[in-house]
Amino acid sequence: MVIEHIRNFSIIAHIDHGKSTLADRLLEFTGTVSAREKQDQFLDKMDLERERGITIKAQTVRLNYRADDGKDYILNLIDTPGHVDFTYEVSRSLTACEGGLLVVDASQGVEAQTLANVYLALDANLEVFVVLNKIDLPAAEPERVKAEIEEIIGLDTHDAVLASAKEGIGTKDILEEIVKKIPPPKGDATKPMKALLFDSWYDQYQGVIILVRLVDGTVKKGDKIQLMSNRKSYEVLKAGVFSPEMRETPMLSAGEVGFIIAGIREVADAKVGDTVTLLHNPCDAALPGYKEVKPMVFSGLYPIDTSQYEQLRDALAKLKLNDSSFSYDPETSLALGFGFRCGFLGLLHMEIIQERLEREFNLELITTAPTVVYRVHGTDGSLTSIQSANQLPPTQEIAYVEEPFILASIHVPNDFVGGILALCEEKRGVQREIKYLTPTRVMVVYELPLNEVVLDFYDRLKSITKGYASLDYELLDYRQSELVRLNIMINGEVVDALSLIIHKDKAYYRGRELVSKMKELIPRQMFEIAIQAAVGTKVIARETVKAMRKDVLAKCYGGDITRKRKLLEKQKEGKKRMKNVGNVELPQEAFLAILKVEG
């Protein structure tokens, strides 16, 4: 295939703006998928992707299209994940393209994540053109949205394509625009092979399958390839393209997008953003922009039924095969038993993993409150990174603690700005800017501690704005903060699973809230139970669950007072003894409810 006739493009869109449906129409129009095989959201292979309507892993498909100029073109659609947690993956997928379609819902306008991804595309020097989707809706306002795109992003929209993926309107116009506007890939098939690895997943029969975009050179079955970040080498067993099922081809050459199967055992070896080259004729330098992805949010996962521990371990190992950005280590808790401490890229990533464990592996799990990575500077000059309250050293050994801050951009309709500002202030935010994008939409930019965002920020953001807000964030830096460890004690015993790292100013309110919640949840016993919240040795809140009392005098009809007194004294003694040996059984609901207490 002549390199001039290849077009590599991706579709940039916010969740729910119709990206996957548009991809379905392009597949049908070019005859890539017959009507019989058709199913909605063809490229979203996981059930969860279909259900939540989001794309989690990048997918690619090759479309053959005969344009109006009579020439045959190969169009490679690289489908990118659209969510904030997967920004690095998006940036790598975009680097594999020369152009992008910015799909915007004609009834809703520009959203925060669309913006973030468009900026990534423009940074990667992609040719971006605009498609206004859902123009068949009665609420569609194409002219207003065009003006908004020009105002906010600065893209020219006078020749934007008006389309409705659902009705199939405008599909041909989009394909023609791709051929006309997006430049062909630059590359030289005679140079040593150099390819960008932009996704990988595990197949239980063939090992790891990697998706690559060849920049220079060619690759075919039998070649020995090398991954440049770890210098590991493999023999190519199969190479080919997706159309949309996997199809082997004699070779892949510069400018093309396809897959390579080379007996790679672990996804962790095939890292997104790595450069693939030939072992015996390597390229001189790796492609720029590769970085290791580090988990940002941590949470403990414990099976409700302890006999499911082995199943949970196997399930995590299977998920890890497909998702190298996710990490897990075994941990134990006195209250919850054996479980795992898991690291995620962000909140959505965490929810998806939990949901997949419950849905695909039928596990019932308890999740501890999410935490972030703190840096603890010791009085002896040491620096340690910790992920949970139980790892925090005693106060006298800490010089100071630093926590990660993020820069959050929130897009909201202007009726809700007051509520958003109040929420950000409550979460210890520092206001950076408020910008009116249009008379009705506002962008609010805040610096926020990630610790405050991981708990319930997103849910509260959505409820304040009735679901209209969109959030995008990036990591800024670490800053010194007054953080303390808040312990919850029951009859003087610390319950490790409920310990939190929290800002000093909030400890009192949070402690009081937790103990009053616990009081409602712990069933009454035969002895009284003291529930306390403490910072260090100082108790800051207390509630008492009163004892149940058996009427020991029921069988004394009338009779002597000394007899009654003897029975009451005996009961009192018994309760005292019981309190010393009695264990308080905490119901599972108590843990689950406490994790939901608002921060």
From Swiss-Prot:
InterPro entries: EF-4, EFG_III/V, EFG_V-like, EFTu-like_2, G_TR_CS, LepA_C_sf, LepA_CTD, LepA_IV. This is Elongation factor 4. GO terms for molecular function: GTP binding; GTPase activity; ribosome binding; translation elongation factor activity. GTP binds at residues 16-21, 133-136. One of its GO terms (biological process) is positive regulation of translation. Required for accurate and efficient protein synthesis under certain stress conditions. May act as a fidelity factor of the translation reaction, by catalyzing a one-codon backward translocation of tRNAs on improperly translocated ribosomes. Back-translocation proceeds from a post-translocation (POST) complex to a pre-translocation (PRE) complex, thus giving elongation factor G a second chance to translocate the tRNAs correctly. Binds to ribosomes in a GTP-dependent manner. It comes from Citrifermentans bemidjiense (strain ATCC BAA-1014 / DSM 16622 / JCM 12645 / Bem). Transmembrane segments: none annotated. Residues 4-186 form the tr-type G domain. Keywords: Cell inner membrane, Cell membrane, GTP-binding, Hydrolase, Membrane, Nucleotide-binding, Protein biosynthesis. It comes from the Bacteria. NCBIfam families: lepA, small_GTP. One of its GO terms (cellular component) is plasma membrane. Belongs to the TRAFAC class translation factor GTPase superfamily. Classic translation factor GTPase family. LepA subfamily. Its EC number is 3.6.5.n1. PANTHER family: TRANSLATION FACTOR GUF1 HOMOLOG, CHLOROPLASTIC, TRANSLATION FACTOR GUF1-RELATED. It catalyses: GTP + H2O = GDP + phosphate + H(+). Its main location: membrane. Signal peptide: none annotated. It is an enzyme of class 3 (hydrolase). It is a peripheral membrane protein. It is found in: Cell inner membrane.
